[in-house]
Amino acid sequence: MLKFSFLFLTVEKPGGLFDFDGTLPLIAIQFLILMFLLNILLYTPLLKIIDERSEYIANNLQEASIILNKANELSSQYEKEFSKIKKEVELDSLTLQNLHKNILEIEIISSQKIFENYLNQTINNFDSEKEKILTSLDEEINSLSSEIITKIVA
């Protein structure tokens, strides 16, 4: 049986490997019909979907670039406004610091004046008390000295 199958495989039809009989045009027609059907049923809708997707992506990229440009413009505008506001805040801060410094200096000067007035008043009170005490001491000294003189003379 092995010999028979071997013989069957070695038998060739006339025409060799490429036989151009009636099957070749039939296969060519089938191939063309298949290509036509695949083109209509598969490739055309697929290409349409791919084109729509490409158009969708292109539109989204264009919108994204427009949004990005707007965002960059807004960012630069906000940065300018921020720097302007920052300068204003720094200027206000310096103004407030100077105002606070001036108020503090005025308070210190007024406190010094009040302290000097109080000190002068206290010194004047001490001087007047000193004068009173010295006067009373003079009177006591005079009275004691007159008593001593009367006791010595007596």
Swiss-Prot record:
Q: What does the record give under GO molecular function?
A: proton-transporting ATP synthase activity, rotational mechanism; proton-transporting ATPase activity, rotational mechanism
A single Gene Ontology CC annotation of this entry is:
chloroplast thylakoid membrane
The membrane topology noted for this protein in its Swiss-Prot or TrEMBL record is: Single-pass membrane protein
Subcellular location per UniProt equals: Plastid, Chloroplast thylakoid membrane
- Name the UniProt key words of this record, in alphabetical order: ATP synthesis, CF(0), Chloroplast, Hydrogen ion transport, Ion transport, Membrane, Plastid, Thylakoid, Transmembrane, Transmembrane helix, Transport
Which InterPro entries does the entry mention? ATP_synth_b, ATP_synth_b/b'su_bac/chlpt, ATP_synthase_B_chain
Family stated for the protein in its record: Belongs to the ATPase B chain family.
Subunit and partners: F-type ATPases have 2 components, F(1) - the catalytic core - and F(0) - the membrane proton channel. F(1) has five subunits: alpha(3), beta(3), gamma(1), delta(1), epsilon(1). F(0) has four main subunits: a(1), b(1), b'(1) and c(10-14). The alpha and beta chains form an alternating ring which encloses part of the gamma chain. F(1) is attached to F(0) by a central stalk formed by the gamma and epsilon chains, while a peripheral stalk is formed by the delta, b and b' chains.
Q: What does this protein do?
A: F(1)F(0) ATP synthase produces ATP from ADP in the presence of a proton or sodium gradient. F-type ATPases consist of two structural domains, F(1) containing the extramembraneous catalytic core and F(0) containing the membrane proton channel, linked together by a central stalk and a peripheral stalk. During catalysis, ATP synthesis in the catalytic domain of F(1) is coupled via a rotary mechanism of the central stalk subunits to proton translocation.
Q: Can you say what this protein is called?
A: ATP synthase subunit b', chloroplastic
Q: Which organism is it from?
A: Vaucheria litorea (Yellow-green alga)
